[in-house]
Swiss-Prot record:
Subunit structure and binding partners: Part of the 50S ribosomal subunit.
GO cellular component, one term: ribonucleoprotein complex
Descriptive protein name: Large ribosomal subunit protein uL24
Entry-linked SUPFAM superfamilies: Translation proteins SH3-like domain
Alphabetic keyword roster: Ribonucleoprotein, Ribosomal protein, RNA-binding, rRNA-binding
Provenance organism: Campylobacter jejuni subsp. jejuni serotype O:2 (strain ATCC 700819 / NCTC 11168)
Residues that span the membrane, as ranges: none
UniProt keyword rRNA-binding present: yes
Record-stated family: Belongs to the universal ribosomal protein uL24 family.
PROSITE patterns recorded: RIBOSOMAL_L24
Function statement: One of two assembly initiator proteins, it binds directly to the 5'-end of the 23S rRNA, where it nucleates assembly of the 50S subunit. One of the proteins that surrounds the polypeptide exit tunnel on the outside of the subunit.
SMART domains: KOW
Keyword Transferase: no
An example Gene Ontology molecular-function term: rRNA binding
């Protein structure tokens, strides 16, 4: 049975637990099957990029990673 999620893409949320506790941001993506959300500017991870035609040297990028939906609360706008 599917769970009805109260948080949608584009909502403003506040992180209530974890390393980014207290930060607010916009929801960039919602994953209902795994009950995870991606919040702008929170849970940043450094990802390695292989060399390609666009980026011949490769390198690293900072990317927002999904966090559990129970770790965020919707904020009134």
């Amino acid at each position: 049975m599917a769970v009805k999620l109260k948080i949608k893409k584009g909502d403003s949320v506040k992180v209530i637990t974890g390393d980014d506790k207290g930060k607010t941001g916009k929801v960039l993506a919602v994953y209902p099957k795994t009950l995870k959300v991606v919040v702008e500017g929170c849970k940043i991870a450094k990802k390695a990029i292989k060399p390609s035609e666009k980026n011949p040297n490769g390198g690293f990028i900072n990317k927002e990673m999904p966090m559990d939906i129970s770790n965020v609360a919707k904020v009134q706008e």
